[in-house]
Amino acid sequence: NGLMIGSGVSLSEVAEHPEILNNFPALAKAASLVSAPQLRNMGTIGGNLCLDTRCNYYNQTFPWRKALGFCLKKPESPMQNDAICWVARSSPKCLAVSSSDCAPVMVALDAEFHLMNPDGKRIVPAGEFYKNDGMDFLNKTPDELLVSIRLPLHEGWKMN
């Protein structure tokens, strides 16, 4: 009972699909707000859910970062121990945040993420897929792919 979405479905298709609009309007809205129409037409729901974290510091130019000193996300320094999180200087770990527009909605909807690698398939609840670490931010191994998302239909729920 629910809706399966392949990870390769475009964000535009997610935003405009009648079943998603009817049963999961928050997801349709989130997908419709991603970037520009051209990127929604080419970008996929799986790609949006697995986006790298963003850091206001790391997303600066190399000369800018070199002048200030390097960070945990991208040390670029032979002295990795010297790298700190410039977002939260007292933190021992990187605190870059998720930039996925659809991830919070998937967590709220109790979505399940279906991952696959050569050894098989596993299912991870959306709420357990994301970690509180800017560098090691997804609960998946490097050889795993997000292949589909299952959205459960909850009886009696009404969304506006």
Describe the predicted segments one by one.
Residues N1-N160:
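C-terminal structural segment of proteins
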